[in-house]
From Swiss-Prot:
Catalytic activity: IMP + L-aspartate + GTP = N(6)-(1,2-dicarboxyethyl)-AMP + GDP + phosphate + 2 H(+)
One term of GO molecular function: adenylosuccinate synthase activity
Chief location category: cytoplasm
Residues engaged in binding IMP: 13-16, 38-41, 128, 142, 223, 238, 302
Cofactor binding mode and count: Binds 1 Mg(2+) ion per subunit.
Name the UniProt record assigns to this protein: Adenylosuccinate synthetase
Length: 430
């Protein structure tokens, strides 16, 4: 029984897809356990970029099983489009498995997402308008439609009719918006269900059988700990639990079967959308990091907010997700800066604190306390070991590990597979 969970430790976009792809080489099953197509991950293989939103990064290994777990909310339209994209690129999807218990995102979820966001005005959350929140709302309200329901023509029609009638009343009476047509949705989405039917199964059985047989299973989280609905910067969060604990609920695997948790972070911090960001940069340094790091959302294309590395955030993520190993990405983006900064604590009303406040009002008053380190000018994209890094870059990597309190297993100096350097094998340490 060998399993590893990969989680983002910041606000998403840390390079989880890259690290999942890297760790997938030694895994036999790769599974997603939460989120939906609001998440985007980019994998670079032989210089070619692949952008995925729903399908796990392990799909590029045809001999390995890729699982979309029950905790994921699935937009069938997006999934069918993503499958076609992979097929056009010559990638087989015969190794994909989709949980019959996963909930379905339908057009009324997306319309409601947009209407709710518009109604918030200046208090908007910055949602991707993918229908994720409303789909999870229906799930919690016990009126959601699952993949198993989508495949049953009569059940799907019955539940869609009930749900759509309720949503249309909401659209017309509360939002003065156009109602949606039952026939159009039913025909389109039932057809999508038939297209994905071959992949649908009880994925909990697949995952538990694999673990019981001693196979290596890799769990891939979406978004990041700071977007977790319980542990993140609420309400500027996603609607699911990206933390490692989400694996047990979102995949149907018990907590006793989790061995290691790899936290993925960048050598700086980024965030898409609204919400607290204590180390955010608004100057030319921030603009430089954004451009060099290509900090634009995979899903939205929106420019990401960027800032210095925040060890307060990282220690919070370590605690609530039980992180055992750290993967540090994008060190190369900081090359060329005379000075690099790391936030080591916050100043809250004149008092030094080293924890991340739950209160948004307190967070607004938090000022980062920085430790400054000398930068490096060298191009490090060709570095293949820690010793090859310039001394100042090496010191930066070590200091990050010290402040977070977790051993760094890998560091990356670029987006390619070959640019991920191993300091300690996660699989071998189990």
């Amino acid at each position: 029984m060998t399993s590893v969970v990969v989680v983002g430790t910041q606000w998403g976009d840390e390079g989880k897809g890259k690290i999942t792809d890297f760790l997938s080489a030694d895994a036999e099953v790769i599974a997603r356990y939460q989120g939906g197509d609001n998440a985007g991950h980019t994998i670079v293989i032989d210089g070619k970029k692949f952008k995925l939103h729903l399908i796990p990064s392990g799909i590029f290994f045809p001999q390995k099983i890729s699982v979309i777990g029950n905790g994921v909310v699935v937009n069938p339209k997006s999934l069918v489009k993503e499958l076609a994209y992979l097929h056009d690129e010559g990638v087989t999807t015969d190794n994909l498995r989709i949980s019959d218990r996963a909930h379905v995102i339908l057009p009324y979820h997306i319309q409601l997402d947009q209407l709710q966001e518009d109604a918030k005005g200046d208090n908007k959350i910055g949602t991707t308008i993918k229908g994720i929140g409303p789909a999870y709302m229906d799930k919690a309200a016990r009126v959601g439609i699952r993949i198993a329901d989508l495949l049953d023509k009569d059940i799907f029609a019955e539940r869609l009719r009930i749900n759509l009638a309720e949503k249309n009343r909401l659209f017309e009476k509360m939002y003065d918006s156009t109602p949606l047509d039952f026939d159009a949705i039913f025909e389109e989405y039932y057809a999508y269900g038939q297209e994905i039917k071959q992949y649908v199964t009880d994925t909990s059985v697949i995952l538990n059988d694999a673990l019981d047989a001693g196979k290596r299973v890799l769990f891939e989280g979406a978004q990041g700990v700071m977007l977790d609905i319980d542990q993140g910067t609420y309400p500027f969060v996603t609607s699911s639990n990206p933390v490692a604990g989400g694996v047990t609920i979102g995949s149907g695997v018990g907590p006793s079967k989790i061995n290691k948790v790899v936290g993925v972070c960048k050598a700086y911090t980024s965030r898409v959308g609204d919400g607290p960001f204590p180390t955010e940069l608004f100057d030319e340094v921030g603009e430089r990091i954004r451009e060099v790091g290509h900090e634009y959302g995979t899903t939205t294309g929106r420019p990401r907010r960027v800032g210095w590395f925040d060890s307060v955030v990282m220690r919070h993520s370590r605690r609530v997700s039980g992180i055992t190993n750290l993967s540090l990405n994008s060190i190369d983006v900081l090359s060329g800066l005379d000075t690099v900064k790391i936030c080591v604590a916050y100043d809250l009303d004149g008092k030094r604190i080293d924890y991340y406040p739950a209160s948004l009002e307190q967070l607004k008053r938090c000022k980062p306390i920085y430790e400054e380190l000398p930068g490096w000018q060298e191009d490090i994209t060709g570095v293949r070991s820690l010793d090859e890094l310039p001394e100042n870059a090496r010191n930066y990597v070590r200091r990050v590990g010290e402040l977070v309190g977790v051993r760094i297993s890998t560091f990356s100096v670029g987006p390619g597979r070959e640019q991920t350097n191993i300091l300690e094998s996660v699989w071998a340490s189990i």
